[in-house]
């Protein structure tokens, strides 16, 4: 890790007040990062010092000893660090990952007594990017991390999956309407259909809130179905009531958690969840009136998040549609409503102007949501 320039007084304060994370035996050449900075570690690397207290995300990619250019999948984990805290971790050579098992208290205390000698092997926290990190995570609490992180705490770019059925025997394959092993495929589609159904290994999946697929209440009339399909406030409120009953603002922590897992952890499923959750928030006009403070904070969150991603990232390769512009177009249209809080309305107008100037996104065209909506009625629903 390269030396960083820091104000001497700040460096002194962080040296005595900051937290320290020691990682023993991490192989030379491993790509390692904390929050918004990453490096290739050298042979003397033992961890990071002078870390400001709070939530942090540490991540790494192992390298192939035989071919150092071959880098493994990104893995990471969140830590909640305290003033003058010391966390001791070690590299597992067998699993090629950081072992998150807590070190014995005796080892931690011995390490604390030896910190001055260890100091030369610890890289200083990149304080220059702390402001950016806080802007991306200011709604992520320790409770958010505990609720959402996998049971094993390891966040991996690639899911650790197992087949739902082992299908070791012919009778198992017949039960799934699959041909015998070794039978030649007649088409690409048939080959895909033969692939076994997979599920995440227990304890490895991120525990995101379940988002509704049905946007209207049971027994809704056709008119109500249409209403709730255009304004998703009912569906959003069910999520807030079930997942965040004491504080609706906590949904913003989950939005930030998903974004960090995607941006720094390279977790595609987290990006998909971020999109679905953002879509639910942006298409809920009635909720903007009820939860105006939540939406004021949402704009600030999006301002910082969108600064980290190229403008064309959200464009669908096939359709050329931009998910974000179409979603925000509906949001800005709803935010213009006279019923919406004046502060929220003004902030939305400024944010729209900022995006138009920075990314040249066009929000002036009529949103697709203004076109007639065709909704699928539940089976058995009668038209009045």
Swiss-Prot record:
GO biological processes: spliceosomal tri-snRNP complex assembly
Positions carrying N-acetylalanine are 2
Which UniProt keywords are listed? Acetylation, mRNA processing, mRNA splicing, Spliceosome
The organism sits in which domain of life? Eukaryota
Gene Ontology CC terms, in alphabetical order: spliceosomal complex
Q: Pfam families given for it?
A: AAR2, AAR2_1st
CDD domains assigned: Aar2_C (cd13778), Aar2_N (cd13777)
How would you summarize the oligomeric state and partners of this protein?
Answer: Interacts with PRPF8 (via RNase H homology domain). Component of a U5 snRNP complex that contains PRPF8.
Give the protein's function. Answer: Component of the U5 snRNP complex that is required for spliceosome assembly and for pre-mRNA splicing.
Q: Which family does it belong to?
A: Belongs to the AAR2 family.
- What protein does this entry describe? Protein AAR2 homolog
What are the leading ranks of the lineage? Answer: Eukaryota, Metazoa, Chordata, Craniata, Vertebrata
